[in-house]
Amino acid sequence: KWIVKEHEIDRMAGWFGSPRGLLVIVSSRFIPASRVPTFVTAGILRLGLPRLSLLLFAAALVWTPVLMLLGSTLGPPFMEQFPRYKQYAAWIVLGLFAFIWFFTHWVVPAMTWRGRREIVMKVRGLMQPSLWPGWILYLPVRLGIVLLSLRHRRLTAFASANPALGRVGGFIGDAKSLLLRPFQRDSRCCPTLALSLEDTQEERVKDAAAFAACHGFPVVFKPEVAEDGAGLRFVHTQEQLERLVRGAQEDFLLQKFIPGFEFEVVWRRNPGKDDGRIMALVHKHDVTVRGDGEQTLEELIWLDEVAVSRANLFLRCHARDLNRVIPAGQKVTLNLTGSYGHGARCRHRADLTTVELDAAVTQFAKRFPGLHFARFDLRANSMEDLKAGRFIVTEVGGCCHVSSLLRDESLRFSRSYAAVWGQLKACLEAGAYNLRQKVRPVPFEELMARWSQARGRHDEFAVSEEL
């Protein structure tokens, strides 16, 4: 609920008492417009008044003579030159701000080990397209959806690829339980219980308890409408489950926890034909660090060459344990789910696509006769099980749920975009075919309402309300 958690304030309070934090207080005497924010922050983080006063007094003793000397020495020459450069004042001020920003964000951090690791993270975030923010990375994809839809003379043509699947063909924002419902009788579909706010609170608690008793803990708690793991919880006890169910402000579902490796499969069927094939398979890798008995979890994150690329995310996910020294040999998984949004790595694994897997996924997809394009989240005990076609489906996505190939840094950018573009074309072709068969088009307003509901969420389960 709050932007800043209490345990985060405690962690930052410790930092403010460190030499680096004390240096910030001293430097506020020298940087214009920084004193008031520094004083307020020091108060919020409970820095003692005697220490704060002593630091400011020492800074004043250093700064005041220097300021007076600079004013008396450089003041008269500056005032003589001021009229000549007055017309460039705006550019000079902008340049000064740019210099200050560059100095504080790049030069100052480079003076410490952690700062240099932060620079590594920043440089990778700029240079590796797979690490770009989603709104930038997927902008060409969204423009492609619009352009291809206009080519088929209907802006929502893609939503007709899967008639009667969910409310909007399985597009972003469709209810998860509705997309899973056609497949529930298949043993390869993860056991799921949908609970609506239309039911009474006691009914929801009773049904949830019965589900947990049947399938055991942990169970997975998910909002009906969410993307990229937003709002997801792993529930380990009956007390946690009851608290979540009673506090729910939206429809949600419970799922049996399925261990094993996690994969993402994009599947298509050619319009008007009884076929089907896998277009892409992505393996969701865990990001792990191993303790040495000396380093804290935060230090291990900054040390690891993989984890450092998304260090800020992992620091938020594990905010409570950052100062804990990890015992030697103990492995810590940094991503808390298989979602990229929670830190998992995405790897294209075309070598895992076998004839058996292709046939098994196609057989599963045909449980819903109108399905032409879908993305399935799979769990398998091993790579061999997956290649043999033995898996459990935990989620189903419909139209325009393209694969996470763009998040695979090992692929050339042009290759991953070409693959995603091919998936979009397959989805649009199916939608256009169904429209020619007189399928009712999905209203644009309903499509946008669903999309905005899913994208409007800001709760990342790893840093949201505590359990």
Model-derived features: where do they sit?
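Transmembrane alpha-helical segments of integral membrane proteins
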Residues: 65-77
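Hydrophobic residues within alpha-helical transmembrane segments
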Residues: 27-31, 54, 58, 62, ...
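ATP-dependent carboxylate/phosphate-activation module, predominantly the ATP-grasp catalytic core
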Residues: 268-367, 397, 402-427
